[in-house]
Amino acid sequence: MGFTGAEVLLAAAFFLVGVAKGSAMNACTILVSDNSADRTRGMNLMHSCYACGALLCPFLIAAAARVSTSLAVFLLAALGVVLWLVYWKTPMEGKVKDRKAAIDWSFLRSGRFWLLTGLLFCQNAAEQSVTGWMVTYFKGSGIIAGTLAAYTVTVMWGATLVARLLIAFVFPFKSPRKAMVVMAVTCTLFYMLLMRADSQPAAILLLFAFAFAMAGMNPTAVASAGRMTSVTSMSIMLPAASSGAILMPWVIGRVAERAGLAAGMAMNIVPCVGLIIFSVLVERLSEQEYERS
């Protein structure tokens, strides 16, 4: 892409980045789960690193693009090489080597597995809908104008990074299941208030609060899989959950075409409410069911 500028290579690059991201998240989830005494802290720390990269990389690439578009593309390629080198040097043994070679499909019979998958589906749907549509919504409604509108995603990633670091190091969850219920309720409340925001300061503040409230949901839910965390289970849970990030933005777009963007964004309350339902169901599992599933 850097040498030719061919658009077909750009499309191929997006596809390969998607494959690489999914594979990296799957592999890192297994490694962190197998090598962390506290899975919730480990997952939040891992996702903090992800948020840090998502927050800083756009500024780095934008700076390179001011020099040359090709430089920005080559820089992305260089970062990909660095990622490959990191995996090459990362010790992969740990506890994984002690596991049996036979694939264990028992997680498919676990109610907890499917409840957590549903929870992650709603989390991905709600988060990516805001990430994908909020700039357009703010500009279209006139709430946030100019260059500030382009930095709404930066606000979200900043809030996400702060929240995950606080969970990992300052305020660790004593009861992750109850914490997920609190996060689900608060992020739903903040989203409803965000939809009613009519000024720039209120919109930015509520967007920060929404992202902050939701930040710990994904890593905490994945960590709650406990003993079910394996290459096979994550290969089903994470892609199934990620489909929410594809489906919900499409639903919002279809509704927006017919009833306006405000109505489309209001549809995002559905996965937010889904977060509450699934988190409550996970929390209501008895300790015996939770350990057995």
Language model regions located:
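Intracellular juxtamembrane helix-capping segments at the cytosolic ends
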Residues: 22-36, 214-229
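A late C-terminal transmembrane helix in Major Facilitator Superfamily
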Residues: 228-261, 265-271
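Cytoplasmic helix-loop-helix junction between adjacent transmembrane helices
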Residues: 13-48
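C-terminal ends and interior cores of transmembrane alpha-helices
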Residues: 1-5, 186-198
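C-terminal membrane-cytosol helix-exit motif in multi-pass small-molecule transporters
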Residues: 62, 72, 77-97, 278-283
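Hydrophobic core of transmembrane alpha-helices in multi-pass small-molecule transporters
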Residues: 9-23, 202-215
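Extracytoplasmic gate region of multi-pass secondary transporters
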Residues: 111-162
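Helix-to-loop junctions at the C-terminal end of transmembrane segments
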Residues: 65, 163-175, 256-257
